[in-house]
Structures are given as structure tokens and as C-alpha cells.
Amino acid sequence: MRAIHQIVAGYANGDAISNEVRVMRALFRSWGYASQIYSEQKRILPELRGEARDLAASRGDFRPEDVVLLHLSIGSDVNDLFPGLPGRKAILYHNITPPEYFRGVQEQTASLLDRGRRQAKALADSAEVVMADSRFNAEEIAAMGHANPQVLPLVLDFAMLRAKPDRRILRQYRDGMANILFVGRCAPNKKIEDLLN
């Protein structure tokens, strides 16, 4: 094995999967492997195009002795390209939200989620190793036909989480009131209304 390459549906700042692939790339490189991140060109944030490559234009980068890790999270052209790439294959499943949560709210997102779930089923038997970032997700991808998924918890850069708090912001919330912090996207499946109730 000379390289461990990762494939993601999109690459951005502040996104959990993008953050994880950055940490994993640094880890793979520290172990002595070449490692690149690939995505669809249109789904790579323009200012990050130096960090990630367009998969469709870079298929020649892959060799039979490489490991190719697909982060499976939504419908994408990269999911269709993955099985045809040379190299040993692995999938890390991050969950694909049921599209029903987005029907009538964000139809384009619902379509991508539906496509992703269909692609996840079609990818069964395409990888030697299948992982998921939680037991729930492992059970879900197993139900889609993937054999023996293992749990690999989210890989984090803990140094980034040790930032000093902003004293100005802390003062704003020292008013004796109860404060609730929601960390996540405001999206139908996150059920923020349950938190507010």
C-alpha cells in the first residue's frame, strides 16, 4: 500500500465529515502514506480547491495497491465512481437521513438523500471493509446489505476543541437565565422544536 485516499460527497469548512477527513489525512500522512481527498469539483468549496481534488478528473491518481476510503453520507456522483476505481476499497458510513424529513421543505436535498440511500444499497459488496461512525449507523448499513460493518467513532482533532472561551460571549450569558446550546444544522431531522418544547 502506497496511499490511503479518501472520497467525500462535498468538502467544506465547519462540516463534520470534512473536518474528519482532514484529521484522517494528517494521520495517514504521519504514518508515511500519501493521502489525498477527492470530491465532486462543484461540491468543493472554492477556497478549499487546493486541499481537495476533483475525483472525475483525477481517476488516474489511484493504483491497485492503494486503499480507497469512501465517506458515505448523501447521494453523489462520487458514489457511482467509487466501485470502478483501482485499489482496495473501504466505506465509512456516516448516515443518510431518510428523505421524508425533507419532502415539502427542501426537495433538492430530499432527492440527494433518496439517491444516496439507493447508492448505499447498490454499493453492498463493493468494499472489503465497511465501517460506520456509530452502532446505529452500523445497523442501518447492515440492513442495506453490507456485511459485518464495524464501528469507527468520529475521528476528531481534540486540539481544536480546547480553544479558550471568548470572555465577551460568556458575559452575555451570565444573566441568571437557563441557556440551551444547540450544536447542529437547523434541519427537519434535527428536531430542534423538541429542544424548544
Where do the language-model regions lie?
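Nucleotide-activated donor-dependent transferases that construct or modify glycoconjugates
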Residues: 1-13
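Short hydrophobic "strand-cap" motifs at the C-terminus of beta-strands
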Residues: 7-8, 133, 155, 182-184
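Active-site helix-initiating loop/hinge in glycosyltransferases
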Residues: 16, 188-197
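Extended catalytic core of nucleotide-activated donor transferases of GT-like folds
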Residues: 45-126
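Donor nucleotide-sugar binding/catalytic pocket of nucleotide-sugar-dependent glycosyltransferases
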Residues: 110, 121-167, 174
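Conserved donor-binding/catalytic core segment of Leloir-type glycosyltransferases
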Residues: 131, 171-190
